[in-house]
């Protein structure tokens, strides 16, 4: 990476240079592998659970360096992760795979733009949601939240609230929908 040689990145992550690779902790092993990934200039870079074992500060540093690398050397970066909320703002295209089957493969904005969470008193939510494309729902006390696909949330009756669904909530809702099949 321009402006950030491997040595500088090593110092930023405080990687111990006096240990063998197999003697590194889980976190520092992850740091070693992600430094390798950040240092190559290839058309494709694959990161499989790159922040495994990293503390919040090191995860944040990795995400910043990932964006910097992309800005300096645009390429396709595949990031496989369970920490969806942490990377959601970095992801342009999302592929959701479950048990070897692709469930979704689309631009991230396209996946979440048409999904809404609507919540309020259970009876009011049920009446309003009837006939809509509800793909998951949850109840907490007397409040109910449904996640719906498509528009049509402009006509909410009094007492209901809507908000956009983020990528992690979309993912969880999709998995719950799959579980019900």
For the regions a protein language model found, what residue spans apply to each?
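A short, surface-exposed alpha-helical micro-motif characterized by mixed small hydrophobic
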Residues: 87-89
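Helix N-cap at the start of a conserved alpha-helix in ABC-type nucleotide-binding domains
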Residues: 56-58
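Conserved H-loop
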Residues: 74-83
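Short loop immediately C-terminal to the Walker-B catalytic DE motif
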Residues: 51-52
């Amino acid at each position: 990476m321009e402006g950030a040689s491997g040595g500088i990145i090593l110092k930023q992550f405080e990687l111990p240079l006096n240990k063998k690779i197999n003697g590194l902790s889980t976190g520092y092993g992850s740091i070693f592998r992600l430094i390798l990934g950040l240092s190559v200039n290839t058309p494709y870079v694959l990161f499989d659970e790159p922040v495994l074992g990293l503390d919040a500060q090191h995860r944040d540093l990795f995400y910043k360096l990932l964006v910097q690398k992309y800005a300096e050397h645009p390429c396709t970066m595949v990031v496989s992760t369970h920490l969806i909320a942490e990377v959601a703002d970095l992801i342009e295209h999302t592929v959701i795979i479950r048990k070897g089957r692709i469930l979704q493969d689309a631009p991230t904005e396209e996946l979440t733009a048409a999904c809404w969470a609507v919540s309020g008193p259970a009876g009011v939510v049920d009446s309003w949601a009837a006939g809509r494309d509800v793909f998951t729902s949850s109840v907490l006390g007397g409040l109910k939240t449904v996640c719906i696909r498509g528009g049509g949330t402009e006509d909410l009756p009094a007492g209901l609230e809507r908000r956009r669904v983020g990528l992690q909530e979309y993912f969880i809702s999709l998995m719950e929908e799959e579980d019900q099949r």
